[in-house]
Amino acid sequence: MGRECEITGKKTMFGNNVPRKGLSRKKGGGGQHIGVKTRRTFKVNLINKKFFVPELGKSINIKVSASTLRSISKLGLSVFLKKNSKKIEDFI
């Protein structure tokens, strides 16, 4: 799958670096001057995590993003998978 969260499907995004200089007009300046845009990538913060599944009585390894991991710790793995319409059997 590459750099992709196995539960939510988050993956690398692409965008621009936009350098800005000068004080904004709102703050009393002459306006911001935008330089040349440079392409860049926004990579997902992925973590390989081992989760224990009490229903199966064993552990499973899942590659998840950090934001997904926070949600799993709040809700629990089975509730979060159900919310994202995934099944535990998909990760075995």
UniProtKB/Swiss-Prot annotation:
GO terms for cellular component: ribonucleoprotein complex; ribosome. It comes from the Bacteria. The keyword Cell membrane does not apply. The keyword Ribosomal protein applies. Keywords: Ribonucleoprotein, Ribosomal protein. One of its GO terms (molecular function) is structural constituent of ribosome. GO terms for biological process: translation. Gene3D superfamilies: Ribosomal protein L28/L24 (2.30.170.40). Pfam families: Ribosomal_L28 (PF00830). Belongs to the bacterial ribosomal protein bL28 family. HAMAP family: Ribosomal_bL28 (MF_00373). This is Large ribosomal subunit protein bL28. The gene is rpmB.
